[in-house]
């Protein structure tokens, strides 16, 4: 059981904070993790999209149209990159304000979770002890059978398998009993935790705190929208000439094709 708990802990540690331990860096914030994931995702899309554009431009039709799609694609990538740089601090400020405004709720829930954890810990320790006892019981039963297999070689393999079946069923039934007992012991605490959460939400709904939080969230969103407008306008101005050039090229090609067809 300790190995299972340790494995899960290592999994989460490796997935979130381990690299900061080895690098001696400060742990990433929630916004930093989201930003890193989004950056990797967008970069992957840009790289794969550029490959498709390059393939089309190399085709006969692409060479005939001469749209310079790869150059335009790189221009779009550069413009979007500038947009990300401009919006990064604004968005980070939004998340920071949001986290500050919800600190009180997280603190209340953490207190309840810590209290429940202390109450259920004896049941978890008891379950771990029972688990270890059953594993030792299982090893004692299986050990002699393994020795017989080594001595009797292959002809006794089928007999060994038949003798292992009831042992496996026995350990399964015994562990199922312990799991059911643990579930029964923890059930009241799960219900209590749900009740406390419902009480917190009801209290939040009836208090002025929720109205204040809604106002703050609305203000944060409004601020984010206002600060993002210049960056979005820069993006629009950067893309407009490229789109107009693209449209003019396509229309010219259509007119030329129509003239050729009409003269035939």
UniProtKB/Swiss-Prot annotation:
It comes from Peromyscus maniculatus bairdii. InterPro entries: ApoA_E (IPR000074), Apolipoprotein_A1/A4/E (IPR050163). Sequence repeats lie at residues 67-88, 89-110, 111-121, 122-143, 144-165, 166-187, 188-207, 208-229, 230-240, 241-264. Belongs to the apolipoprotein A1/A4/E family. PANTHER family: APOLIPOPROTEIN, APOLIPOPROTEIN A-I. This is Apolipoprotein A-I. The modification Methionine sulfoxide is found at residues 109, 193, 242. Homodimer. Interacts with APOA1BP and CLU. Component of a sperm activating protein complex (SPAP), consisting of APOA1, an immunoglobulin heavy chain, an immunoglobulin light chain and albumin. Interacts with NDRG1. Interacts with SCGB3A2. Interacts with NAXE and YJEFN3. Participates in the reverse transport of cholesterol from tissues to the liver for excretion by promoting cholesterol efflux from tissues and by acting as a cofactor for the lecithin cholesterol acyltransferase (LCAT). As part of the SPAP complex, activates spermatozoa motility. Keywords: Cholesterol metabolism, Glycoprotein, HDL, Lipid metabolism, Lipid transport, Lipoprotein, Oxidation, Palmitate, Phosphoprotein, Repeat, Secreted, Signal, Steroid metabolism, Sterol metabolism, Transport. It holds the Pfam family Apolipoprotein. GO terms for cellular component: chylomicron; extracellular vesicle; high-density lipoprotein particle; low-density lipoprotein particle; very-low-density lipoprotein particle. It is found in: Secreted. Residues 67-264 are annotated as: 10 X approximate tandem repeats. GO terms for molecular function: cholesterol transfer activity; phosphatidylcholine-sterol O-acyltransferase activator activity; phospholipid binding; protein homodimerization activity.
